[in-house]
């Protein structure tokens, strides 16, 4: 008599039923900010593309970058114009900080997250593993 409830066969059967995305180990790489200094302003040419890649609201993302850099700025089409001179390294560092805090899941490390509001608290909810982490509001 064959044992259908053998642990290894159950484990194999369970793994076969999982979607392929679970086993993919794709590194999430944000496009580098295409920024340059013009006079006393820093312009990020591909800002909206970066926000779209992360699936975040460009206005909220811009608010975070401006707050972190301690400056004012304005969205103009697909560009973000910041008051002040900032090097590309500093701009990319702030973008990476945003990704680590507001995009990547702290449990599984995947970028499949959404920011949801429950009551007065904002949470980073992972659609891949279901984890929820409270995040600071912008």
From Swiss-Prot:
Keyword Phosphoprotein found: no
Any one GO MF annotation of this record: translation initiation factor activity
TM helices/strands, residue ranges: none
One Pfam family named in its UniProt record: eIF-5_eIF-2B
Entries under Gene3D superfamilies matching the protein: 3.30.30.170
Keywords for this protein: Initiation factor, Protein biosynthesis
Keyword Ligase part of the UniProt annotation: no
Source superkingdom: Archaea
Task performed by this protein: eIF-2 functions in the early steps of protein synthesis by forming a ternary complex with GTP and initiator tRNA.
Subunit details: Heterotrimer composed of an alpha, a beta and a gamma chain.
Family that this chain belongs to: Belongs to the eIF-2-beta/eIF-5 family.
NCBIfam families: aIF-2beta, PRK03988.1
Identification of the protein by name: Translation initiation factor 2 subunit beta
Natural source organism: Methanococcus maripaludis (strain DSM 14266 / JCM 13030 / NBRC 101832 / S2 / LL)
Gene: eif2b
């Amino acid at each position: 008599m064959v044992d259908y409830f053998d642990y290894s066969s159950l484990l194999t059967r369970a793994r076969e039923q999982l979607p392929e995305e679970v086993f993919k180990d794709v590194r999430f790489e944000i496009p580098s900010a295409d920024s340059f200094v013009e006079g006393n302003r820093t312009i990020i040419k591909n800002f909206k593309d970066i926000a779209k890649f992360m699936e975040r609201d460009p206005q909220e993302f811009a608010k975070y970058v401006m707050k972190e850099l301690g400056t004012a700025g304005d969205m103009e089409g697909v560009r973000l114009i910041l008051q002040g001179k900032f090097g590309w390294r500093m701009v990319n560092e702030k973008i990476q900080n945003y990704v680590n805090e507001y995009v990547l899941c702290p449990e599984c490390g995947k970028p499949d997250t959404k920011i949801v509001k429950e009551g007065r608290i904002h949470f980073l909810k992972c659609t891949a593993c279901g984890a929820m982490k409270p995040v600071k509001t912008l």
